[in-house]
A protein has these predicted regions:
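Conserved C-terminal beta-signal and adjacent last beta-strands/turns
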Residues: 16-21, 29, 383, 406-407, ...
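Outer-membrane beta-barrel translocator/receptor signature
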Residues: 157-160, 171-250, 256-260, 313, ...
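Acidic/polar loop-and-plug regions of large Gram-negative outer-membrane beta-barrel proteins
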Residues: 232-236, 249-322, 337-385, 430-460, ...
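Structural signature of Gram-negative outer-membrane beta-barrels, strongest in the C-terminal barrel
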Residues: 253-257, 385, 404-416, 458-578
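Face-selective signature of the C-terminal outer-membrane beta-barrel domain
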Residues: 315-337, 376-494
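Membrane-embedded beta-barrel scaffold of Gram-negative outer-membrane proteins
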Residues: 320-322, 327-334, 338-346, 525, ...
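Gram-negative outer-membrane beta-barrel transporters
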Residues: 477, 575, 594-678
Length: 747
């Protein structure tokens, strides 16, 4: 059986109250000064502030536009679903190592599914993770199609924004997890000169250097470029593991007039070492070992010669042309090739765990020793994935009487091929590890004893074609969004070992409807219904691939986005159900069967505000009540890794006057409630709170405008905690205190 790469969801029962009161006199981003004109006085009128674009930078931490929820450049308050945007401005405050770290203050998103590991950006959104072993992440509106262990990640330094859309999204994107998706927006060329160099050094021997250059190539701004890159090396938290990353993203824009834009986008990333990607048992983490002690937070159960590497190549473009005031055509296209290679020994629970009931090594131990000897397995894996995606859209703006329409019609196509050449070690393929006196040694990954290991050589192919239509119809203050999509999703799996092929072709219609009411004061209540479908990659006892799971959601919410202030406050109540979930065979076979159901009900609140030029505040609260409502084994239980409560609060203050002028001080806290550690709900992972801090100094005062030096601290008090568990044998230590010094120079 293949080693599971993706952790699954969970529950929690503790209550938290977070009260934030902020009193601020009315402020605006822009200030005006009125001077009574005198004779012969020349009056200069300032140009209006540039309009924020859904595909460009936001001036503050509170983005007002997004295309993730509609595929059109839409104000956030007009989208009938919950959307959170983490801007480059906000990422600069925290300097995250990964995109999932950048989302730490975002509601409805669990980022601790792998603890301190940043190998992948795995997320659980509204209680649901992506099916199987894949992420549900997008870049510039196109899915970063992954398969098995072969998932791409993007470095946050390369991004303009990271956006979370919560709830089913199949009406626009086709097959998808019901919980929602992550869409990242690349940095794009500017016509204004940008020259940035950045240096970082910190905990775990971190050293990183990055650069970001952009400018127009001609006097008229018809041609422009951007070149962003970085190199990073560090030790992972777990002893003996390393992280190395080299990335570069060349981009080029041709804009012959104000109606046409063609931007070439590319991304190349090489990671000789992606860091630690193992797991630990609940004994020694959540619970003490029989000797009363716990494993250290830097414990590594793998072999000394474990390796995990990844290489990513992506090229594509974004094109849009406005024919007139009515019609605009857009097309996004990308070709990607990803390679992943690993030799990994990983833990599989202590010998007393039922998961090791068939281990001969464990059976040979005395009963008193089974609680502190760790069973281990291994995987040798080489994969090559190729993916082509294209999305073509026609936007039409017109009116029918008093109703203004933004009509979007589109067709997208995706083709993926992943060639997997793997070998899995089963029970007794790796020597046991004494957790009282662990000695990590090299492992012979070439041994491949057929008595306890075997090949896994699979060629997976997937295709998806979708046609969709969406109308955003506004009459006075009432906005109705209605959309539908029809998908043809095909998948084929060739087993090179058995010489067999499994195929499945699915056709699915999904739709979304929503109503928003736009009050003049910036308050917008809304209601929506949306659907999703998600094909399975697993095979049943009849040898056929399972039918897709389906999701449906009802959401009621309110958004507050005042016209003249950079403030975005949202709140939502949702009821989300995933049907046709896989569950254990009631007849007792080792195969799963269809027919399960999971329901998640939740409440989310988020506030992002640049209250003044000096003050930023970000706060969120999440309540999720998830439950297996239909299941052979787990009915009534809560999925693993889904805390019932999460909350966060961040604030920073910048001094502009006096001796502290240029200094920024910031601090924040992140609370994650307790969660269940396995689908059987046999144990719980405790709640935890970590505190972050920032000290930054703007070097403009010493003649270096746009440059700064900063000190970022995550987990300020070095709280030791277990981030989550997906089973009794799979738990993850949370990140230790991270101290990073950053120097950013612009010239």
């Amino acid at each position: 059986m293949a080693r599971s790469k993706t952790a699954q969801p969970k529950h929690s029962l503790r209550k938290i109250a977070v009260v934030v009161a902020t009193a601020v006199s009315g402020m605006s981003v822009y200030a005006q000064a009125a001077v009574e004109p005198k004779e012969d006085t020349i009056t200069v009128t300032a140009a209006p502030a540039p309009q924020e674009s859904a595909w460009g930078p936001a001036a503050t931490i509170a983005a007002r536009q997004s295309a993730t929820g509609t595929k059109t450049d839409t104000p956030i308050q007009k989208v009938p679903q919950s959307i959170s945007v983490v801007t480059a401005e906000e990422m600069a405050l925290h300097q995250p190592k990964s995109v999932k770290e950048a989302l730490s203050y975002t509601p409805g998103v669990s980022v601790g599914t792998r603890g301190a590991s940043n190998t992948y950006d795995h997320l659980i959104i509204r209680g649901f993770a992506a099916e199987g072993q894949s992420q549900n992440n997008y870049l510039n509106g196109l899915k970063l199609q992954g398969n098995f262990y072969n998932d791409a990640v993007i470095d946050p330094y390369m991004l303009e924004r990271a956006e979370i859309m919560r709830g089913p999204v199949s009406v626009l994107y086709g097959k998808s997890s019901p919980g929602g998706l992550l869409n990242m927006v690349s940095k794009r060329p500017t016509t204004e000169p940008l020259k940035e160099v950045q240096f970082k050094a910190g905990t775990d021997s971190l050293f990183q250097t990055g650069f970001d250059f952009s400018d127009s190539l001609d006097d008229d701004g018809v041609y422009s470029y951007r070149l962003t890159g970085l190199a990073r090396s560090a030790n992972a938290q777990q002893k003996g593991s390393e992280e190395q990353r080299y990335a570069i993203a060349p981009a080029f824009t041709w804009r012959p007039d104000d109606k046409t834009n063609f931007t070439f986008l590319s991304y190349f990333q090489n990671e000789p070492e992606t860091g630690y990607y193992g797991w630990l048992p609940k004994e020694g983490t959540v619970e003490p070992l029989p000797n009363g002690k716990r494993l250290p937070t830097d414990f590594n159960e793998g072999a000394k010669n474990n390796t995990y590497s990844r290489n990513e190549k992506m090229v594509g473009y974004s094109f849009d042309h406005e024919f007139n005031d009515t019609f605009t055509v857009r097309q996004n296209l990308r070709f990607a090739e990803n390679k992943t290679s690993q030799n990994s020994v990983y833990g599989y629970g202590v010998c007393s765990d039922p998961a090791n009931a068939y281990s001969k090594q464990c059976a040979a131990l005395a009963p008193a020793d089974k609680g502190h000897y760790l069973a281990r397995k291994y995987v040798v894996d080489d994969e090559k994935l190729q993916n082509f995606s294209v999305d073509t859209q026609l936007q039409s703006k017109f009116a029918t009487g008093d109703i203004d329409h933004t009509l979007l019609t589109g067709v997208d196509f995706m083709r993926m091929r992943n060639d997997i050449n793997a070998w899995f070690g089963y029970d007794d393929s790796v020597p046991l590890l004494n957790l009282y006196n662990p000695v990590n040694t090299d492992f012979d990954f070439n041994a491949k004893d057929p008595a306890n290991s075997g090949p896994y050589r699979i060629l997976n192919k997937q295709k998806q074609t979708g046609v969709y239509v969406q109308d955003q119809a506004q009459w006075d203050k009432v906005l109705v969004t209605l959309g539908g999509r029809y998908d043809w999703a095909d998948q084929e799996s060739l087993n090179r070992v058995a010489g067999t092929t499994d195929k499945r072709d699915d056709k699915q219609f999904t739709w979304r409807g929503g109503v928003n009411y736009l009050f003049d004061n910036g308050v917008t209540p809304y209601f929506s219904y949306s659907e999703s479908f998600e094909p399975s990659s697993q095979v049943g006892k009849d040898g056929n691939i399972f039918a897709p799971s389906k999701g449906k959601q009802y959401e009621v919410g309110v958004k507050y986005v005042p016209e003249d202030r950079p403030i975005v406050v949202t709140g939502a109540v949702n009821n989300l159900t995933k049907t046709n979930n896989l569950m254990a065979d009631p007849e007792g076979s080792f195969f799963s069967v269809e027919g399960g159901e999971i329901r998640a009900r939740g409440v989310e609140i988020e506030a992002k505000a640049a209250l003044s030029a000096s003050v930023n505040v970000v706060g969120s609260y999440t309540y999720t009540d998830a439950e297996y409502t239909t299941d052979t084994t787990y009915k009534g239980n809560t999925p693993a890794q889904v805390p019932k409560h999460m909350a966060s609060l961040w604030a920073d203050y910048t001094f502009f006057d006096g001796p502290l002028s240029g200094l920024t001080l910031g601090t924040g806290g992140r609370y994650t409630g307790s969660s269940y550690g396995d689908p059987a709900n046999s144990f719980k992972v405790g709640s935890y709170t970590v505190v972050d801090a920032l000290v930054r100094y703007d070097l403009a005062r010493v003649g270096m405008a746009g440059s700064n030096v900063a000190l970022h601290v995550n987990n300020l008090f070095d709280r030791e905690y277990v981030a989550s568990c997906f089973n009794t044998y799979g738990c993850f230590w949370g990140a230790e205190r991270q101290v990073v010094a950053t120097a950013t120079f612009r010239f």
